[in-house]
């Protein structure tokens, strides 16, 4: 008997909560396990389906067996009597070994539902052990997950709300969610709203087929849901990333983070260098300003005392000193108008005479 499912698929968790937690697969599995255990324990005994039983030719033993209050000795007697006709049939059919292995597991008509449950569980355990023993080395499962990229997200949408919206439409299970927080501009200033916004994100599904169907179905459609919902009129912008895995995403994120950090370090070093040059210029300017003030004070003192060298116009010659660059004289071959002729050796003249 199946339990009744909830029909309110469009319920969205409130975004007013302060705790912004992402998806945790372990916590989700634990919560599912607890819920299944609680349902199994709270289910009434009349809803449990009884196990199949084999009809056996057993003689009735009094009316005490109807109320189910017989003793253990009576049950044992019934079991022995029920096994006798079975053994006779086994001998006639020639399958004694197989039936003997099954006879201690078969429940009698007087057995309780708890006993039948234990026998079924033991049989399943035997099957699982034999299957694992036959295949000791199982091949590892391939990574068949699919990733969808969201180029834009509705404002103030939390990861848990995004997961609930996708699962409510039948696209699951979702294993991982990663959303990039949007960077606020400096011109916006400080705002009282503490809710976070996300610019883009990635969602990993347990199946590639589910991810493809989700991207093809929901792309360029409105979020929908309740008429007065916060995200009713927003549009989905998603794309299935073929051949893209979650490890590639983490590698890309780390690479971009390293690039931004390296760029920031270069900018900081450049800013520090410019700051040093500026401070050196300021200090040098202060030194020159102090020298100029001292010279002005000295000029005032000389004017007041009437001392100092006086130049043209009666001004005190305390200006900047005139620098003279001394030039080296160029040596000339001619001296006193007489040009010195260079003498040529006799050997050289003889060789030149033979050539020319």
Swiss-Prot record:
This is Pre-rRNA-processing protein ESF2. Residues 13-23, 72-103 have a biased composition (Acidic residues). Residues 108-134 have a biased composition (Low complexity). GO terms for cellular component: nucleolus. GO terms for biological process: endonucleolytic cleavage in 5'-ETS of tricistronic rRNA transcript (SSU-rRNA, 5.8S rRNA, LSU-rRNA); endonucleolytic cleavage in ITS1 to separate SSU-rRNA from 5.8S rRNA and LSU-rRNA from tricistronic rRNA transcript (SSU-rRNA, 5.8S rRNA, LSU-rRNA); endonucleolytic cleavage to generate mature 5'-end of SSU-rRNA from (SSU-rRNA, 5.8S rRNA, LSU-rRNA); small-subunit processome assembly. Belongs to the ESF2/ABP1 family. PANTHER family: ACTIVATOR OF BASAL TRANSCRIPTION 1. The keyword Nucleus applies. Its main location: nucleus. Involved in the small subunit (SSU) processome assembly and function, and in the 18S rRNA synthesis. Required for the early cleavages at sites A0, A1 and A2. Residues 1-141, 298-318 are annotated as: Disordered. The gene is ESF2. The keyword Magnesium does not apply. Residues 34-43 have a biased composition (Polar residues). GO terms for molecular function: RNA binding. Keywords: Nucleus, Ribosome biogenesis, RNA-binding, rRNA processing.
């Amino acid at each position: 008997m199946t339990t009744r499912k909830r029909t309110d698929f469009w319920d969205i968790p409130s975004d007013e909560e302060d705790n912004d937690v992402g998806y945790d697969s372990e916590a989700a599995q634990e919560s599912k396990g607890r819920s299944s255990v609680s349902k199994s324990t709270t289910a009434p005994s009349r809803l449990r389906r009884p196990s199949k039983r084999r009809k056996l030719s057993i003689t009735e033993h009094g009316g005490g067996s109807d109320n189910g209050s017989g003793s253990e000795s009576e049950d044992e007697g019934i079991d022995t009597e029920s096994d006798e006709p079975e053994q006779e049939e086994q001998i006639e059919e020639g399958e004694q070994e197989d039936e003997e292995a099954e006879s201690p597991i078969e429940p009698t008509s007087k057995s309780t539902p708890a006993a039948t449950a234990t026998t079924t569980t033991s049989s399943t355990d035997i099957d699982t052990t034999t299957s694992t023993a036959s295949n000791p080395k199982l091949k590892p499962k391939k990574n068949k997950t699919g990733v969808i990229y969201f180029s834009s997200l509705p404002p103030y949408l939390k990861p848990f709300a995004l997961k609930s919206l996708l699962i409510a439409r039948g696209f699951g299970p979702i294993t991982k969610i990663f959303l990039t927080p949007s960077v606020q501009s400096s011109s916006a200033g400080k705002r009282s709203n503490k809710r976070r916004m996300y610019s883009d994100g990635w969602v990993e599904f347990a199946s590639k087929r589910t991810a493809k169907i989700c991207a093809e179905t929901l792309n360029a459609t409105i979020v929908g849901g309740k008429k007065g919902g916060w995200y009713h009129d927003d549009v989905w912008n998603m794309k299935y990333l073929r051949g893209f895995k979650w490890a590639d995403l983490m590698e890309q994120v780390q690479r971009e983070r390293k690039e931004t950090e390296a760029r920031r370090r270069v900018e900081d070093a450049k800013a520090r260098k410019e700051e040093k040059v500026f401070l050196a210029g300021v200090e040098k300017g202060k030194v020159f300003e102090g020298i100029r003030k001292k010279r002005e004070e000295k000029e005032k003192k000389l004017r007041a005392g009437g001392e100092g060298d006086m130049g043209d116009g009666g001004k005190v010659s305390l200006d900047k000193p005139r620098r003279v660059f001394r030039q080296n004289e160029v040596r000339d071959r001619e001296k006193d108008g007489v040009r010195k002729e260079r003498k040529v050796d006799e050997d050289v003249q003889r060789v030149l005479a033979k050539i020319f």
